[in-house]
Design a protein with these regions (language model features):
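Acidic/histidine-rich, surface-exposed loop or edge segments in extracytoplasmic proteins
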Residues: 26-33, 96-110
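Acidic/histidine-rich alpha-helical segments that form the ligand environment
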Residues: 109-145, 154-167
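Surface-exposed helix-capping loop/turn segments at secondary-structure junctions
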Residues: 53-62, 132-141, 178-184
Length: 189
């Protein structure tokens, strides 16, 4: 019985210490919704952009071909698509039209070189950061028009698209890189 009580007392003291630490950390690190959402964009940007930079320009037209891959986007098309969605979602959050050509989620046909594609991508992340910076506790859950379908959504819901959509395509791009003998930068030691 004494051992059981000692274990419970130790456990209680440990939990109390951990919860106090967590509370003081939470108070010191309290962030706004906008800051949290911006952190998500920074995370995907920090992996996506280096992956886009890692592929040599002569491989930007690469798409898997062994198996049933008809209609799969090339490496360059993956990047332009993510950038276009960043602009589309950012514009919806801001309540405006995209400031650049998004070409039905494909990105502009005129953007072809690696340098131009990377510029389009990086500027789309700047626009995404600008969009989430306008999100406040007051407008976070306010119903707004969404660019995908006819229903209403929220700025919070749309802001999550930057991360999950970017990482969805990052996963595909990581495979493309590896199929070309390139270790994605985020996987390097």
């Amino acid at each position: 019985m004494k051992k059981t009580i000692a274990v419970f007392v130790s456990l209680f003291v440990s939990l109390l210490a951990m919860s106090s630490f967590g509370v003081s950390q939470a108070v010191a690190e309290k962030k706004t919704a906008s800051q949290v959402l911006d952190g998500g964009i920074k995370t995907v940007e920090g992996e996506f952009v280096p992956a886009a930079e890692a592929m040599p320009e002569d491989k930007y037209d690469f798409a898997p071909s062994n198996g049933d891959f008809k209609g799969v986007r090339t490496f360059a098309q993956q990047i332009k698509h993510v950038a276009a969605i960043n602009y589309i979602v950012g514009a919806a959050i801001l309540g405006e039209k995209p400031p650049v050509d998004v070409n039905e989620e494909k990105g502009p046909d005129s953007v072809k070189s690696k340098a131009d594609i990377l510029k389009y991508l990086k500027e789309s992340f700047v626009y995404a950061h600008k969009a989430v910076a306008t999100i406040t506790e007051a407008n976070l859950l306010e119903p707004i028009a969404v660019p995908f379908g006819k229903e209403k959504g929220t700025r919070l819901g749309l802001a999550t698209v930057f991360a999950w959509h970017g990482f969805d395509h990052y996963g595909q791009m990581a495979v493309y890189l590896r199929m070309n003998g390139i270790v994605p930068p985020a996987s390097r030691n």
